[in-house]
Amino acid sequence: IDSAASKGFIAGSEPCIYHVLAIAVAPGNPLNITRLSDLTNDGVRVAIGDPTGPAVGSAAKKMLESAGYWEDIQDNIVVQSGTVNELLVYMSMDQADAAIIWEDLLDNSDLEQVDIPIDEGFVKVIPIGTLTFSENPEEAQAFADFVASDEGLGIFEKHGFEIYPSAKYGDA
């Protein structure tokens, strides 16, 4: 939304939820993966999104580079998927030991979630916005108001998203 706002396309916006990367592991966490650096251990098969494709891939690369693990993890990457949902498939088919994925996708999954500390992780505040050139500005604003309402945010929360603001992530 920042790019659209810089071009004057956003009439108004409000922060709503967080998009957060986490590590998905098999039930019971058989390799005892507890932190990002564990993904560089010998023999750990890692799945990530394609860094030139889906947002989860570019975010994972950015996070791993920032934490200093991007080069060290290369030999462990067994797949770079074209979609975020493929990461869940690779994990469920035991084609990878760990995947870097959005935490909300793990909410209704049999996989276990390993949180990445905020100082190493990727946390992004996701807003709702309306467009300056909307053909139906009143309806657009009504929808944005609903999304940002307690009821709208409750739907996001029900599906595994952390609601903004939270003590856990702050302003990210």
Predicted regions and their residues:
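Exported/periplasmic ABC-transporter solute-binding proteins
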Residues: 1-172
